[in-house]
Amino acid sequence: MSKLIYGLAGPTASGKTSLSILLAKKINAEIISVDSSLVYKGMDIGTAKPTLQEQDGIKHHLIDIIEPTGNFSVADFISSVNKLKKEIWARGREVLLVGGTMLYFKGLIEGLSALPESQAEIREALEYQKKAKGLQYLHQQLNEIDPQSAQKINPNDQQRIFRALEVIMISGKKYSELVKTSKVGGLDEDLKLCALVPNDRSILHKNIESRFRQMLDQGFLDEVQNLHKNPMLTKETTAIRSVGYRQAWEYLDGDISYDEFVKKGIVATRQLAKRQLTWIRNWQSSINIVAMENETKELDILKYFGYK
């Protein structure tokens, strides 16, 4: 009989962290973080990274594993999960996936498109073109070759622009066509996924604003200031494009006022939550939806997982 993998998804500020600790204790699990921002070292406050005290003795994985200058793709995530699950099971524990990066969950559920691997020389050529003519030029080039892909990719998203152009240069085919081909990877096991959603969206919005202001009190700007000193980082770096960090960077660059930074940071976080909830709605026929306000949510999730 195939092993089961358990999952808890939800929008930012929905209470995933504290609930996941309770669940992990009940089912004897280790937690694998499903969060594209928690992988970065030195980005603790703005990502609401669980402290050792908050982890409460539960082993966590895929937290603080790379520098902010690096990238951690969906493929990297899937590969890591497939390696970690075996190690966790060998220790006699269950696997509990927890987070809000829905592209990571999507990769586990659906697998990845069979795209060619990255080639260093092509990346270097694209980097040279970007320095010479700018990222907007590369996005324009993509639009001329593959308008369908260009339309879906933000003109400031260097990682995805580079990847789309790289795939086109290697394969000679449109990126938008290749991503529709057969999928590879993902999980071999069944994923029992629960998702927290708010009955009242205004409660989630209040949680988001409250947590953002709490982060400021905890020294979030000092954290970003420390990152800002690194000449290898810009506001277009994948890590710095994380919600809150991008807006703080603009403030430190002098592009916006402090009040604008706070307002934009809160709005951007609410927009992130809206996108996360859209993903969850699209999956609602195959996952278990639990109201974040529900006082019996822990018991309801345990029952869905098959525990009493």
Curated annotation (Swiss-Prot):
Site, as annotated: Interaction with substrate tRNA: T101, R123
Family: Belongs to the IPP transferase family.
GO molecular function per UniProt: ATP binding; tRNA dimethylallyltransferase activity
Function: Catalyzes the transfer of a dimethylallyl group onto the adenine at position 37 in tRNAs that read codons beginning with uridine, leading to the formation of N6-(dimethylallyl)adenosine (i(6)A).
Name of this chain's protein: tRNA dimethylallyltransferase
Reaction catalyzed: adenosine(37) in tRNA + dimethylallyl diphosphate = N(6)-dimethylallyladenosine(37) in tRNA + diphosphate
EC number: 2.5.1.75
Gene3D superfamilies, A to Z: 1.10.20.140, P-loop containing nucleotide triphosphate hydrolases (3.40.50.300)
Annotated region (Interaction with substrate tRNA), positions in chain: 35-38, 159-163
Record key words, sorted: ATP-binding, Magnesium, Nucleotide-binding, Transferase, tRNA processing
Listed SUPFAM superfamilies: P-loop containing nucleoside triphosphate hydrolases (SSF52540)
UniProt GO BP: tRNA modification
Domain of life where this protein originates: Bacteria
Underlying gene: miaA
Binding partners and assembly: Monomer.
Positions that bind substrate: T12, A13, S14, G15, K16, T17
